[in-house]
């Protein structure tokens, strides 16, 4: 896989550089919504319980597209409708988001039970965690080809 984005970063640290790209309040939630909740459209993202405002959602979708984490696709039979899918770089973030889910489930008070994501038994079981990550990734990829049969890639500006 090639490097996704070249620019000047505040340091040479990969953690800092990654946060420069996806460390805002909304980007990982959009990625989560795509692979975990199978949201694809602007309207679906805007209906998330976190209540992202439409101007910020537009900005984050465009940013994630520009850094090649997601791609914007146009429906062939409806030129006004767009769906968003993860790129290879975006798919590589699935384990990271799942690790954050597990961390939040175990470390944030009053957070458990908000979403039944099947993660409560994964914290100390590396095999179960890897199996879960593989299952979520495969589930996302399995649903993807069905959707892409009616999509056309829109070139990024």
Residue ranges and their predicted role:
Residues 23, 76-100:
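Basic, amphipathic "hinge/linker" alpha-helix immediately C-terminal to the N-terminal HTH DNA-binding motif
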Residues 1-11, 24-25, 47, 101-103:
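Recognition helices and adjacent regulatory flanks at domain boundaries
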Residues 13-52:
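N-terminal helix-turn-helix DNA-binding core of bacterial DNA-binding proteins
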Residues 95-157:
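C-terminal regulatory/oligomerization modules of transcriptional regulators
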Residues 1-4, 8-9, 18, 33, ...:
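Short, contiguous, well-ordered secondary-structure segments
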Residues 49-73, 79:
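Canonical helix-turn-helix DNA-binding module
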Residues 43, 62, 82:
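Residues within the helices of the helix-turn-helix
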């Amino acid at each position: 896989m090639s490097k996704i984005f070249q620019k000047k970063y505040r340091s040479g640290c990969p953690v800092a550089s990654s946060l420069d790209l996806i460390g805002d309040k909304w980007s990982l939630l959009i990625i989560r919504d795509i692979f975990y909740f199978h949201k694809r459209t602007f309207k679906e993202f805007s209906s998330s319980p976190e209540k992202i405002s439409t101007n910020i959602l537009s900005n984050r979708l465009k940013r994630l597209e520009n850094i090649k984490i997601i791609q914007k696709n146009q429906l062939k039979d409806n030129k006004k409708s767009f769906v968003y899918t993860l790129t290879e770089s975006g798919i590589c973030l699935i384990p990271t988001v799942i690790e954050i889910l597990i961390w939040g489930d175990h470390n944030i008070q009053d957070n458990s039970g908000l979403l039944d994501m099947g993660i409560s038994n994964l914290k100390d079981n590396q095999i179960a965690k890897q199996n879960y990550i593989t299952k979520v990734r495969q589930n996302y990829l399995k649903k993807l080809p069905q959707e892409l049969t009616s999509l056309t890639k829109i070139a990024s500006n």
